[in-house]
Structure formats: structure tokens, C-alpha cells
């Protein structure tokens, strides 16, 4: 697939120190209305929350659902040419990553090139044969972008790095300088914070209370029968929304600065995501997951804060839930890693956030 598309190979990454007068969030805002912009913000002082990342000006887009995928590649005129394929999405992404990734160890950056975006839950259908119980929302199962510029801010050192890929189809430094100039000029654009409105009625669940209680009873019966040992009973909340999704993103980050905030400008839809929990991190040949089970509010006084932390640490229920998830993740990772290489380096670690305490394992 990649060869048929004549995709370029990244031969180098130009990395420059980069200073600007804007906050990182305001700098990213200049790109927030352009499709393919991905913003990753890190809040708190946890060891997994060191970097802010902006990926912008994509030269490749990958979108699709089911057996229909579209790879769009920017042409010499600045437009995009779409190539349809029915290739397995995981095989396609694997081929693209191998083609487009570039490991640069000069500055110990978390990323210098690659694909940014999301995988939807419905991609599970490519791996597992499970019942279809959800109403489709019309959004793609996969949405990924390859940026031509990445800005990284180190929250510890306050240093900024601008990463510009060099392709084998570039004729010299001219193309790289053009990408840098585009980015700098974009930062000079005037910008005023947007606004948004959510329905006053609030969030509406996909479950009515009787249906939810009935589902709980069904799960309990499955547990008794030995059909399952764990279930994640999920419900979907929705409300009417209008306005600037990036403004919502910034407002949520201001109120609860969790380690993993993500904004994806996907053109006809936007994704705003926040979580204190790392699902997966792959660095070289190492895979890390950080499940969280166990949450309690921060106290209003130092004494109450300490008491809440102690209560959570001693909670038998939360300990059991976290231990079960750790065992589940160990099993899942063992399926794709070397035999006897999975280990728990930290278990039931108490982490303090602005509004809550969490129990975390690594």
C-alpha cells in the first residue's frame, strides 16, 4: 500500500530551539481550526506529565471505517489526493509507522515524527467477534494525521523544540525552511478566545435507571455462574453543544489539569479527551501501562486531605479492583511481549491531583 502511494521516507529531523511570547495553549490555538491539528497537554506534576505537544499542518491523513479506508497525501499544489483501500487498518498503520517514524536521540524528546489521532473502540471488530450493541455515531473508526511540524514544550526545563521532518523527496533546505516559515507566520495571526455553549438540561445518559439496575443484576448473575469474572458496565452521556471545541478543551484543562489532555481537530468533528490514566506507552522495545482504580476527593483542610489519602490507601474494595486490573493488563501484555518479561514496578501508588487522589500501578 505504501509503495503504491509513493510515500516519502523521513531521512532526518531538523530540530531547533524555539522561543515565542505566547503561552503554549495560545500558540496551539492558532492552529486549532485547521484539520489535522492535534494538541496534547500535560497537567499536574506527575512523572508522566512532562511535555506539551502540538502537531500541525499534516501532509498525510488516514480515515475510515469498516473495510473502507482513505489515505490522503498532500500533492505539490497543496491539495490532498485520496487513495481508497480495503487493507486491514492495523496492517496499514504498521506499514505507515515503519515508513514515517524517525527516532532522534539528540534531545531526548518524546516524539519527533509519526502519526497523531485516534483509534475508535469499534476497531475491536477487526480483532474480536463480539455483539454489536451500540448505535453508530457516523464517525470514523480510525483518524490519523502525519504532521509536517511538531512543537514540543518541556515543562521541567521550559525549553521549546520545533521538529521539522526532512523527506527523501525534498530537493534541499528550501522545503524545510518553508515549513518553518509557515509555522512562524501562523503564530503571528491574531486570535481571540472562542466561546461555547452546552444545553442547560445537562448530560443525558444512554441508560434509564431501571435499565441500568437490570444490567447490574445480569452481571451479578453472570459472575455467579462463572461466565465472567469482571465487567465494565459503561454508559454514554450526551448533550447539545455549540461553539468552539478548543475553548471547551482549554476550560476543562484549566479546571482539572490531568496528565493526559488531547484535542483532535478532525474537520467535520472534534475530539476533546482528558484522563489521569495512561493506557499504553511504547518506547523502543518497552511497553508501559498505568491502570488506575480507586479515587477519593481531596480534603478541604490539610487534616482532611491526609485522612482521605489514608482512607483510600486502606480501602479493601479499591485494592481488589486495582489488583484485578493489574492482573488483566499483565495477561494482555504477555500476549504480545517476551515470555516472563512483564513486571509490576509500582503497585497501589497514591498519586495526588488537583481535585482527587488516585491509586495507580505501573
Model-derived features: where do they sit?
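Extended alpha-helical targeting/anchoring segments
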Residues: 1-362
Amino acid at each position: 500500500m505504501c509503495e503504491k502511494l509513493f510515500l516519502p521516507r523521513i531521512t532526518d529531523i531538523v530540530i531547533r530551539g524555539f522561543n515565542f511570547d505566547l503561552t503554549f495553549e495560545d500558540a496551539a490555538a492558532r492552529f486549532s481550526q485547521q484539520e489535522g491539528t492535534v494538541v496534547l497537554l500535560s497537567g499536574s506534576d506527575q512523572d508522566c506529565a512532562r511535555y506539551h505537544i502540538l502537531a500541525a499542518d499534516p501532509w498525510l491523513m488516514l480515515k475510515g471505517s469498516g473495510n473502507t479506508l482513505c489515505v490522503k497525501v498532500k500533492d505539490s499544489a497543496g491539495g490532498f489526493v485520496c487513495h481508497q483501500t480495503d487493507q486491514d487498518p492495523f496492517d496499514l498503520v504498521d506499514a505507515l509507522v515503519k515508513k514515517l517514524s524517525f527516532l532522534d536521540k539528540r534531545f531526548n524528546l518524546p516524539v519527533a515524527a509519526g502519526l497523531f489521532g485516534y483509534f475508535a473502540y469499534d476497531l475491536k471488530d477487526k480483532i474480536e467477534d463480539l455483539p454489536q450493541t451500540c448505535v453508530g455515531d457516523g464517525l470514523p473508526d480510525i483518524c490519523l494525521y502525519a504532521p509536517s511540524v511538531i512543537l514540543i514544550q518541556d515543562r521541567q526545563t521550559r525549553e521549546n523544540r520545533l521538529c521539522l521532518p526532512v523527506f527523501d523527496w525534498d530537493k534541499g533546505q528550501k522545503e524545510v525552511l518553508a515549513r518553518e516559515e509557515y509555522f512562524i507566520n501562523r503564530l503571528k495571526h491574531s486570535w481571540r478566545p472562542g466561546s461555547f455553549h452546552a444545553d442547560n438540561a445537562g448530560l443525558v445518559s444512554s441508560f434509564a435507571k431501571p435499565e441500568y439496575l437490570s444490567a447490574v443484576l445480569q452481571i451479578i448473575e453472570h459472575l455467579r455462574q462463572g461466565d465472567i469474572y469482571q465487567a465494565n458496565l459503561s454508559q454514554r452521556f450526551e448533550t447539545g453543544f455549540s461553539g468552539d471545541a478548543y475553548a471547551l478543551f482549554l476550560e476543562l484543562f484549566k479546571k482539572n489539569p490531568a496528565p493526559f489532555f488531547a484535542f483532535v481537530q478532525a474537520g467535520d468533528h472534534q475530539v476533546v479527551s482528558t484522563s489521569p490514566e495512561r493506557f499504553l506507552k511504547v518506547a523502543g522495545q518497552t511497553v508501559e501501562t498505568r491502570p488506575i482504580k480507586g479515587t477519593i476527593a481531596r480534603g478541604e483542610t490539610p487534616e482532611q486531605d491526609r485522612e482521605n489519602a489514608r482512607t483510600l490507601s486502606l480501602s479493601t474494595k479499591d485494592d481488589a479492583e486495582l489488583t484485578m486490573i493489574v492482573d488483566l493488563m499483565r495477561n494482555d501484555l504477555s500476549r504480545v511481549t517476551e515470555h516472563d518479561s512483564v513486571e509490576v514496578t509500582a503497585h497501589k501508588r497514591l498519586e495526588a491531583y488537583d481535585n482527587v487522589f488516585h491509586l495507580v500501578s505501573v
